[in-house]
Curated annotation (Swiss-Prot):
UniProt xrefs under PROSITE patterns: GST_CTER, GST_NTER
Functional note: Conjugation of reduced glutathione to a wide number of exogenous and endogenous hydrophobic electrophiles.
Organism taxonomic ancestry: Eukaryota, Metazoa, Spiralia, Lophotrochozoa, Platyhelminthes
Catalytic activity: RX + glutathione = an S-substituted glutathione + a halide anion + H(+)
TM spans (from-to): none
InterPro entries associated with the record: Glutathione-S-Trfase_C-like, Glutathione-S-Trfase_C_sf, Glutathione_S-Trfase, Glutathione_S-Trfase_N, GST_C, GST_superfamily, Thioredoxin-like_sf
Gene3D superfamilies reported in the protein's UniProt record: 1.20.1050.130
Protein name: Glutathione S-transferase class-mu 26 kDa isozyme
Length: 218
């Protein structure tokens, strides 16, 4: 039986997990709750046998998980993608945290009514954060070398999000531009991005000041 993956019908913090599943060509059944299905989720929430009921959830046979990072790490671990030794595993964990600094920075201001004001400070600091990844990729195809790991999909998603904040934010970072294109050119990712299953919008919940609503900005 295919694993079951549940979340809202938004990108949110689970888009990297979707990308990882697609890249691995994992068969999975996604339950994407739409904005008018809050009651449906409330009805399902305590019927799935989840120890800590929440979205996202991932049910793999009799093994049931919630929390986005636990889920993506579990899937990566099943495919021996968490590193071959303690140092490599620690580096991958470090990369997770570094990408999350960007993505969570967006989330901290995305729901605020003063988003346009707060965005200025975020974008002023963004080049410094992006430069660290640019330097990391100076002699690498992917963050951990020549093989894709789940932080690559986390970074791809973070770049996708910040480009909506400032479409010029990668202009000084050619390695990041190449990296983003490299991820998009992975065969399974290319197929997914062109499929009806791909969720382009919203980036956050529907009520977010930035990245919310039903349609992306033109």
């Amino acid at each position: 039986m295919a694993p079951k993956f549940g979340y809202w019908k938004v990108k949110g913090l689970v888009q990297p997990t979707r990308l990882l599943l697609e890249h691995l060509e994992e068969t999975y059944e996604e339950r994407a709750y739409d904005r008018n299905e809050i009651d449906a989720w409330s009805n399902d929430k305590f019927k799935l046998g989840l120890e800590f009921p929440n979205l996202p959830y991932y049910i793999d046979g009799d093994f049931k998980l919630t929390q986005s990072m636990a889920i993506i790490r579990y899937i990566a671990d099943k495919h021996n993608m968490l590193g071959a030794c303690p140092k490599e595993r620690a580096e991958i964990s470090m990369l997770e945290g570094a990408v999350l600094d960007i993505r969570m920075g967006v989330l901290r201001i995305a729901y605020n009514k003063e988003y346009e004001t707060l965005k200025v400070d975020f974008l002023n600091k963004l080049p410094g954060r992006l430069k660290m990844f640019e330097d990391r990729l100076s002699n690498k195809t992917y963050l951990n070398g020549n093989c894709v790991t789940h932080p690559d999909f986390m970074l791809y998603d973070a770049l996708d999000v910040v480009l909506y904040m400032d479409s010029q934010c990668l202009n000084e970072f050619p390695k990041l531009v190449s990296f983003k294109k490299c991820i998009e050119d992975l065969p399974q990712i290319k197929n997914y991005l062109n499929s009806s299953r791909y969720i382009k919008w919203p980036l956050q919940g529907w009520d977010a000041t930035f990245g919310g609503g039903d349609t992306p900005p033109k």
